[in-house]
């Protein structure tokens, strides 16, 4: 179910008001020729051919498709995957960023793709790392349009003086 919470109240004897809170979509994976959306805990929410704006496409999750059930946790090999994906998704929403895809490489690495730019964000400090992406992408687009490359944020800390960008030819 995509409903996280529902509250019904009577506004007056003839009016019932329903307050519905939907579960947030942390990402989606390709599944049986559709998109399978999941929440921050890895619960399969629903399948759809539709792609929702602001929800990242996720690669790198290993699971047995025959064991997936809507409303149940997706049976992935690495349970920490959803924690990292949910954490990254939270800050992508906060900073109004939608990557073309999010790749869960392993428990040590999440990689975001924005066009031809690959952003390595590691597995911690997501807020300060993701906060840097939008201004950097804008600067790259302005100074080096269409330049493919790797943005190294995996070791970036709040007191870091610089961020490396490795262009690809």
For the regions a language model picked out, list residue spans one by one.
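Charged, solvent-exposed interaction patches on well-folded alpha/beta domains
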Residues: 2-169
């Amino acid at each position: 179910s995509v409903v996280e919470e529902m509250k019904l109240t009577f506004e007056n004897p003839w009016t019932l008001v329903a307050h519905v809170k939907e579960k947030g979509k942390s990402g989606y994976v390709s599944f049986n020729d559709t998109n399978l959306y999941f929440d921050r805990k890895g619960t399969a929410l629903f399948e759809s051919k539709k792609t929702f704006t602001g929800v990242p496409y996720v690669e790198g999750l290993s699971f047995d498709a025959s064991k997936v059930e809507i409303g149940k946790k997706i049976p992935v090999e690495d349970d920490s995957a959803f924690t990292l994906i949910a954490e990254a998704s939270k800050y992508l929403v906060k900073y109004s960023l939608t990557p073309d895809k999010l790749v869960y490489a392993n428990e040590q690495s999440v990689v975001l793709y924005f066009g031809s730019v690959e952003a390595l964000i590691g597995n911690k400090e997501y807020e300060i790392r993701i906060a840097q992406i939008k201004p950097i992408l804008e600067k790259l687009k302005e100074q080096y349009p269409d330049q493919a490359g790797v943005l190294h944020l995996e070791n970036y800390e709040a007191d870091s003086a610089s961020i490396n960008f490795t262009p690809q030819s």
